[in-house]
Amino acid sequence: MVQRLSLMATIADDDFPLFKTSINILTGSPAVVYANLMVVWKPNPNYEVDNLNSKNELVEPTRMTTATSIPLELILNDPVSKNNGVDSDEILNTMKEQEFPIKQEQLFDMINNPSNNTINWTLTTADIPAAGSNRKVSMQAIQEATIVHQAGNNPTLANVMAELGYSFDYMYVTVGVRFVHKRDVIIHCHKVWDIAEDNIIQVTKGGYVVHTFVTVNRATDIERLNLAEANLLSLQRDLSGYLDFKVPDRKSMDSRTNLTQKDITL
């Protein structure tokens, strides 16, 4: 389990070129383009699960997230780009207003088709961020594992998650750029698309989400946690007046789920 300290901000579409140039100068690192498919799973309401752990403590059911990268040539619909590289301005400017270039059937196929059983997935569970009105950064405990291969009679990600007692909840795609700053500070700037079976909606139309974070390997490493917080606050000060970094709403980052009667009857 690691601790992730983070801050978030937003920028408008028209501000992206200046943002990219400014962060490139500040960090001294180039923008790395990425596209990720994020699939969120909820506890299967058909199963009766004991919510008490071995210490007789109440454990609330939580969602799990699986993530994998999407080949950028699929985003651009250009197989040549795989060898020639992808320009971040080209891919993000192209996707500001146009429809998402990948059909939702292709994305659902990645989790339901046995022929995709060699796709690597990162499985993540997360606690609700630490409470406290005086917190200057968000702090969240995260656990990650890697699914490198799905086996069995029906080797799909959906079947693997079903065997773990989870069913599909929703999925989304993030496409953006990543910068690596000093002292392990990572900066992501991306757009988000909500993927449903009947349509794809750009949630961030007109702008981008900016997420900066530091990951600390041990929750007991107080010195490292304090240093990570100081580095994030330093970046916040450096970009004040241009980016308004804030602590994200902890409730929006809560992976716990309360199963209602409506959920059970679906």
Swiss-Prot record:
InterPro entries: Mediator_Med18. One of its GO terms (cellular component) is core mediator complex. One of its GO terms (molecular function) is transcription coactivator activity. Gene3D superfamilies: Hypothetical Protein Pfu-838710-001. It is found in: Nucleus. The gene is SRB5. Component of the Mediator complex. Pfam families: Med18. Component of the Mediator complex, a coactivator involved in the regulated transcription of nearly all RNA polymerase II-dependent genes. Mediator functions as a bridge to convey information from gene-specific regulatory proteins to the basal RNA polymerase II transcription machinery. Mediator is recruited to promoters by direct interactions with regulatory proteins and serves as a scaffold for the assembly of a functional preinitiation complex with RNA polymerase II and the general transcription factors. This is Mediator of RNA polymerase II transcription subunit 18. The keyword Transcription applies. Belongs to the Mediator complex subunit 18 family. Keywords: Activator, Nucleus, Transcription, Transcription regulation. It comes from the Eukaryota. One of its GO terms (biological process) is cellular response to heat.
